[in-house]
């Protein structure tokens, strides 16, 4: 069976499932998706995410991984299904997500597999990209508080060990891994509950 799968995909697939979760079985459910349908690739998808849990979608290209994440984030339209998110009181409640703005409002951040296209603005600095999802917190009218922006950006550069000469460095000049750290910093700055 393994040889056939490896020949089909053209590489070795390692399946080493975890024997037990590090998340307590009674950890609260923070996201529940039921019977999500979005386009041809996302058909009747249901899952739960518990607080502290890392949930990954795997599969070959075209299996619907990216499309599921984009529908959950509101970047692609969903035809049907129910999305429930834990609110501030700790209760799951059904929400309507029709756009990325809705998803962000409900505490969801999106880490795209194509970070250069959907995660960062490569011709902007590390500082500017770090605050993209929270720009309203760094502006006073039409002016950006650059000192506050720099302070927050420097904190995440340090916490995530981002290799950059300064926060003024353009993201296009960073390695792919460091660009990904800038995307993560953007959502951490937003204080997203779900990435």
Language-model-detected regions and their locations in the chain:
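Glycine-rich phosphate-binding loops of nucleotide-dependent enzymes
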Residues: 1-195
